[in-house]
Amino acid sequence: MQIDLPESVKEILNKFQKAGFEIYIVGGAVRDILMGRPTNDWDFTTNATPEEILKVVPGGLYNNEFGTVFTPNPDNPENPHEITTYRKEEGYLDYRHPDKITWGKSLEEDLARREATISAMALGPKYEIIDPYCGQEDLKSKIFRAVGNPNERYSEDALRMMRAIRISAQLGFTIEEKTLEAIKKNAALINKIAKERVKEEFFKLLVSPYPREGMLLLRNSNLLQEILPELEKCFGVEQKSPGRHHIYDVGEHLLISLKNCKSTDPLTRFATLIHDIGKPQTYKKLDSGTITFYNHEMVSTKIAENIAERLKFSNKEKEKLITLVRWHQFTVDERQTDSAIRRFIKNVGLENIPDMLSLRIGDRLGGGARETSWRLEEFKKRLLEVQKQPFSIKDLKIDGNDVMKVLSIKPGPK
């Protein structure tokens, strides 16, 4: 296959070769190249020490204990190139970071510490592929497989379990059986990881091409119970009853709603995923067979607030999440007055209207309904019309002084 590398990447390979060092491209970039996917994330590994790396690329930055030097990436300034010395890692008392790092002696030694076969490949200066763990075969078979003993990989760094789910959801891969069993066995270790890092991986999963499948993997791997036990409780809670359009239980409804959410904003997708999370607590089946969830949006809002605090959402993220969940039951009725529309806009916030509509579309499709209706389309038109009207005195284009000028009225005494 033809491999076309950016000039800045070629320059790094050439500089290290001329200086007499080994140098390889590693990580996700190699995987993306082999899959024909674009990438701006370039990682390198070398037998040069950090001090020697800085001599080869004097503009680099080195201020960490992992042997990584950061150099400018002209194609993506916010994501610098990373050049790391071959290394070995030992001991992971915090289930995240190695207790001891020593410089490795070979590329093979360095690749052995990688988490997955599809990430344990290297591309050399002559475009040769080094693949000691048959990562290319797993790429072709669309399989995510841990390197070596998966129990060891996940007890070393528990966040790798979330990454396994996230990468599989991004690529549409299946997790190999022993790897999945190891995640199930070690799922509780995810609680050792900082909540901010868990949220970061969770958000990446939500905006992946296969978010519903990713959520099912989280559930099947026991990770969902550890991260979002409130969502796990939604599965098996029936909704279909006389006069109710829902054809899925609450959990499946939420996953299908997520799948059909048009927004690419991870926070909006998260709100879509949990908008009915209060239904298990408000479930009631009447003698007629009708199922009700009265005030579930209020209960869902409180649960969403607790989740946001637990997963360390910022105040801004928390506010938006609560808003979307609280008002997701908004009424769409052709008889609504302009005042009612204005109240809706005020409650939701003008900036959140597009995301609220995305949630509604996902919610409709997640219940077996069509994407839209004539009432929803009419509601969208009304939103545009009402937005042109002033909401309060301060929104008026003219004020009292303008009126006095037009009517030639002199100002009264101060």
Predicted regions and their residues:
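Catalytic cores of the polymerase beta-like nucleotidyltransferase superfamily
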Residues: 1-414
